[in-house]
Amino acid sequence: MTIVHRRLALAIGDPHGIGPEIALKALQQLSATERSLIKVYGPWSALEQAAQICQMESLLQDLIHEEAGSLAQPAQWGEITPQAGLSTVQSATAAIRACENGEVDAVIACPHHETAIHRAGIAFSGYPSLLANVLGMNEDEVFLMLVGAGLRIVHVTLHESVRSALERLSPQLVVDAVDAAVQTCTLLGVPKPQVAVFGINPHASEGQLFGLEDSQITAPAVETLRKCGLAVDGPMGADMVLAQRKHDLYVAMLHDQGHIPIKLLAPNGASALSIGGRVVLSSVGHGSAMDIAGRGVADSTALLRTIALLGAQPG
């Protein structure tokens, strides 16, 4: 069955992690025609080493590749280094630019290692922040949406303390996240999603028993979204609404509200989309797995599902 119909850019992520390996393993499962629609970005040396470890040297012969990101040879599997962090950003940036210029239709990036990127002196809080910076957007305009196990969960806030998230949350930020997610649902074949907005506090504050945040932030956002003609329920307790599984799109206020259910139900099969910009970028719902890098045992399931998700036939 053909799963790739769109042109995709595939950045290999941290070259010292499992990115090069899972990229090759996923590509091996595609037909030659499908592989011809995917351009790989990253250090060729890391791909060569991964191919040797996985005995996939023949796959490199028809790989469409663009060198992006400098890397000392050989790759230092499992090592967290500034050079690998810089390479991660360089390869992802090149892929984003290719999409922005119309060379490809969407971008997929293998896992990064945040510490390596910070050691390179680069401000970074995940692929959404990188996408925003490359496109010249405010970071508040790009959101993370996890897709897996039949769930689609957009995050209004992401990699920050709970205190910082509460200070930043506003009705408009919630509205912007939902608008971006609804547009993305259309791209994914769900044009009129039923939306559920999680409360900030337990039980969506139980009236105002557990705080004023939901009456001041999420409830006004829901009212605005309904006036725009969207089918939105909430705010509701995340535990209750997820148990019901009646909605197409869920809106998490905080990182763990969205990550825990996805990682519980789809530990190796989730996609992580950065949405809200003119370029759609997706990574996978797991990390760079430095502890198993270079051993040939990494699972490419999540990456293959992400390729299928973004490579699907439009409409």
Curated annotation (Swiss-Prot):
Oxidoreductase among keywords: yes
Presence of the UniProt keyword tRNA-binding in the record: no
Catalytic activity: (3S,4R)-3,4-dihydroxycyclohexa-1,5-diene-1,4-dicarboxylate + NAD(+) = 3,4-dihydroxybenzoate + CO2 + NADH
Pfam family, one: PdxA
Root EC class: oxidoreductase
Keywords noted in UniProt: Metal-binding, NAD, Oxidoreductase
Annotated a divalent metal cation binding sites: H159, H203, H255
Gene Ontology biological process terms in this record: phthalate metabolic process
EC numbers, comma separated: 1.3.1.53
Organism domain of life: Bacteria
MF (Gene Ontology): (3S,4R)-3,4-dihydroxycyclohexa-1,5-diene-1,4-dicarboxylate dehydrogenase activity; metal ion binding; NAD binding
Similarity comment text for this entry: Belongs to the PdxA family.
Function: Involved in the degradation of terephthalate (TPA) via the protocatechuate (PCA) 4,5-cleavage pathway. Catalyzes the dehydrogenation of 1,2-dihydroxy-3,5-cyclohexadiene-1,4-dicarboxylate (DCD) to yield protocatechuate (PCA).
Protein name stated in the entry: 1,2-dihydroxy-3,5-cyclohexadiene-1,4-dicarboxylate dehydrogenase
Upper taxonomic lineage: Bacteria, Pseudomonadati, Pseudomonadota, Betaproteobacteria, Burkholderiales
